Amino acid sequence: MAKKILYQDNARRALERGMEIMVEAVSVTLGPKGRNVVLEKPYGSPQIVNDGVTIAKEINLEDHIENTGVALIRQAASKTNDVAGDGTTTATVLAYAMVKEGLKNVTAGANPISIKLGMEKATQYLVTQINEFAQPVEDIQSIEQVASISAGNDNLIGSLIADALSKVGKEGVISLEEGKGIITELEITEGMKLEKGFISPYFITNTEKMEVSYENPFILLTDKRITLVQQDLLPILEQITKTKRPLLLIAEDVEKEALATLILNKLRGIVNVVAVRAPGFGELRKQMLEDIAVLTGGTVITQDAGLSLENIQVNLLGQARRIIVNKDSTTIVGDGLEIEQIKARCEQLRKQVNIADTGYEKEKLQDRIAKLSGGIAVIRVGAVTETEMKDKKLRLEDAINATRAAVEEGIVPGGGATLAHLAENLLTWAKINLKEDELIGAMIISRAIVAPLKRIAENAGINGPVIIEKVQQQEFEIGYNAAKNVFGNMYDEGIVDPAKVTRSGLQNATSIASMILTTECIIVDETD
């Protein structure tokens, strides 16, 4: 196929045009007065969303070169979403602001490589500043504030997530389910998260989230290596097929031939199955399988117990209300029938802790107790329509991710205030530590990082530059509350952002922007 080649300024300007189209669509959602975006779906009703990364994934332009710009800036949003789970709109707005500022200087003759170096040094300085100013999250109120802001200023969601975290702990699992009514409610149930994911991506049922999710599955637990399906699994698979229920297989390993047969059965719709390697090693693996068996009411198929895979019945399998498996972990949500057995098992493990010889043994036993007794918080999302349900689930996901990020690295003043204040500090630092084109790179960052605050103000119908100037004249904690159109202490107002979200958004935006500024040529397919 013939190729189209663009050089220098033409290449960079074409990328910028694509970025601008995408940023305009995404940034309308920013801030408390941000609007929604309607996405047309090839099937089903249109989706109304307020989530940056979801909008970014939908944008595909006709012009190949502009579309390359969209793909690059989408990367900043996706990477931020992977690391922090929130802050995707901020990352997108930052990346575009950096490119826009940077292109002016590159066009005027500044050296792009020196600019890139200056931008990277400036970002490194800002990251250390963000970490310095971050305040640890210690009370439920702070968690509630972070969750509310991330969910689009929804205090009900904020209190639900704070409640969930207080019950299952900071490391606990929070699972989202579609509720039956219109009220969103919280339920704590037995459950466990294993640090092992699916063996093959062909088991995936939800390609958007890249995960496997099954309701009411059977769970087959064995410490054996599955080599041939015909020999090891065929009898039990035939029994499960009759029940039309899915199967989670947890084994020491599944060899290639057996794995291929399982995948084929899944793809043909004969039996919905997902295979996961058992967690742990050696003796610990057997004990962890026993823990899962207690949680699910099943039996571990092991040689020691005189059981073999060929002649097992369905009554030896465990059961769960729901399982969610991704590439790194498996979450089993219990069905609530094994409460007494779980209590007894935890008691037994606590006795073992008291007589354990080594620190390592004690640590592993305590880890197992935490996994068994911690439980899982299930938030049942209620809504009047399916469209509202999808929007609520996206908001809840953002809020849960933001809350975890806040617990990890602390919180900073929200609403774009942190970056607006740091822009002043950065200028002072850069003038002392950098020179020539590197200084220009730092100044690009300094001018670009006020963009989120500017956009939040503009979405509220207020003049952005005026707000930026007023915020920068105040103390670090003072920012602009767009919901009430007042200035105040962001911690007192409850407008806080997780430091991790601000940091990763800034780093990813700089990474993408500096790559675009150092682009000299684009090669794309020629369209007819």
UniProtKB/Swiss-Prot annotation:
Primary role: Together with its co-chaperonin GroES, plays an essential role in assisting protein folding. The GroEL-GroES system forms a nano-cage that allows encapsulation of the non-native substrate proteins and provides a physical environment optimized to promote and accelerate protein folding.
Name this polypeptide is given: Chaperonin GroEL, chloroplastic
GO cellular component: chloroplast
Residue sites binding ATP per the record: 29-32, 86-90, 415, 481-483, 497
EC number: 5.6.1.7
Organism of this sequence: Trieres chinensis (Marine centric diatom)
UniProt KW keywords: ATP-binding, Chaperone, Chloroplast, Isomerase, Nucleotide-binding, Plastid
SUPFAM superfamilies: GroEL apical domain-like, GroEL equatorial domain-like, GroEL-intermediate domain like
Primary gene name: groEL
Chaperone is among the record's keywords: yes
Cystine pairings recorded for this chain: none
